[in-house]
Amino acid sequence: MARYVFITGGVVSSLGKGIAAAALGALLQARGYRVRLRKLDPYLNVDPGTMSPTQHGEVFVTDDGAETDLDLGHYERFTGRSATKTDNITTGRIYKNIIDKERRGDYLGATVQVIPHVTNEIKDFVTEGNKDYDFVICEIGGTVGDIEAMPFMEAIRQLGNDLPRGTAVYVHLTLMPYIPAAGELKTKPTQHSVKELQALGIHPDILLVRADREIPEAERRKLSLFCNVRPSAVIQALDVANIYDVPMAYHKEGLDDEVLAAFGIEPAPKPRLDQWEEVCNRIRTPEGEVTIAIVGKYTGLKDAYKSLIEALHHGGIANRVKVKLEWIESEVFEKEDPAPYLEKVHGILVPGGFGERGSEGKIHAARFARERKVPYFGICFGMQMAVIEAARNLADVPDASSTEFGPAKEPVVGLMTEWVKGNELQKRTAAGDLGGTMRLGAYKAALKKGTKISEIYGSTDISERHRHRYEVNIDYKDRLESCGLVFSGMSPDGVLPETIEYPDHPWFIGVQYHPELKSRPLDPHPLFASFIEAATEQSRLV
């Protein structure tokens, strides 16, 4: 029988509910429990696929092709369990499901209302498909008091009564700010947040209190008294140097013990955290440092590249080096020489993106890396720009471009209109909807034997996650390969180019997929481990 942990947030947003949920999942998993993590997002979008990266941050793609919240990336990285499309739902998706049912007549003429129809839809989502799990951790997006979150709060309140007694625990993550003028940590914001939650009928079992310094015992007792929780259930969540310290920090504070106690479970056996200790030790005691330039177009919000950042750090963990990131807005290179920005870095990474803005800057970055023999990693759009650069400057195709930017004389990159997913032929047109219509999720690729990328993977058959609607035009393959660019990986049917590389370059690889989505701190992705290894070698030359 599954037990449910509901994690809510108060006082301010961005406190780290996703990290808290992921860390708790890792701790329970380290005790041998089977854990599932789910995210409930209050916004009205059906999914984040069409949302601006500078507003929402990264769109995390699952193996089964769902475009989801970036917190699912944290869940995967901390637990190693691959998320699915059934692990994330939004208000938009819920209302769409309900409206579809109403149009079909499923409600038999009833007046469709928030209670019970919306709340029932939420409850069904939370409780379905959990028979193989010991714990289901549900993170509620937003902050207590947000009008958008009200149906979710009501649904989890009802679940407290619907589920068997003792199978639901509520954890409230809140902030205890330090006021320099008073020289004190203040409990009042947390008190008011809990009162707001209690007014909704939810009484938290555990308070997880964010603070930038130790919380005095007297303040903990005060929170216990006014928030109606046991003293042992007031758990401080102090700032840490890196997010991979969080599981051990929370274990030290007793979060997992307290959660188990709230369920009436003896907190044994102790979690096996030796792998986490090794990861954190490597982060704390690096044997070197490399600088990686990320030439992107959404650098104003680092969360737009969340999985990418983490995957680079995983590569650092694998090589026992610290990875320093230099963020460069790609449009800069459309006006300025890239050399002053790039000549001191040890590796260049051009990530995914959409649209013409900044594309020429990415092409200049790819040319610099190719000519100067600097390790280059092009992901999705970054691979496409590297191919356009090769077409223009090596294959004598000066008008090489992408149809994503408009009509092109030489469409080296073009819209995919047909591809195979499983046994089904997928078809798209330029006039179709944007949402959910890309090549999404895990696809297999066949790597050419003897290439660098096949050696890195240790295999010629791979599966990686995709999120794109444009693809390198195979009609230019022979012309480009005659100039030294190797198409080292193709879709199994030989139609879609998946990876490229230069054999005469120390490390120049482009991939059409997103390998960062499958990297873990306990299991770094081989491409990122190899890229950072190459950057480490480059650091000895610069």
Swiss-Prot record:
Keyword Ligase: yes
Gene3D superfamilies attached to this UniProt entry: 3.40.50.880, P-loop containing nucleotide triphosphate hydrolases
Enzyme class: ligase
Binding locations of CTP: S13, D146, I147, E148, K186, T187, K188, P189, T190, Q191, K222
Binding positions (Mg(2+)): D71, E139
UniProt keyword terms in alphabetical order: ATP-binding, Glutamine amidotransferase, Ligase, Magnesium, Metal-binding, Nucleotide-binding, Pyrimidine biosynthesis
Residues noted as binding UTP in the record, renumbered to the chain: S13, K186, T187, K188, P189, T190, Q191, K222
Residue ranges of every copy of the Glutamine amidotransferase type-1 domain listed in the record: 291-541
Family according to the record: Belongs to the CTP synthase family.
Additional remarks: CTPSs have evolved a hybrid strategy for distinguishing between UTP and CTP. The overlapping regions of the product feedback inhibitory and substrate sites recognize a common feature in both compounds, the triphosphate moiety. To differentiate isosteric substrate and product pyrimidine rings, an additional pocket far from the expected kinase/ligase catalytic site, specifically recognizes the cytosine and ribose portions of the product inhibitor.
UniProt protein name: CTP synthase
Organism: Rhizobium etli (strain CIAT 652)
Lineage: Bacteria, Pseudomonadati, Pseudomonadota, Alphaproteobacteria, Hyphomicrobiales
Gene name of this polypeptide: pyrG
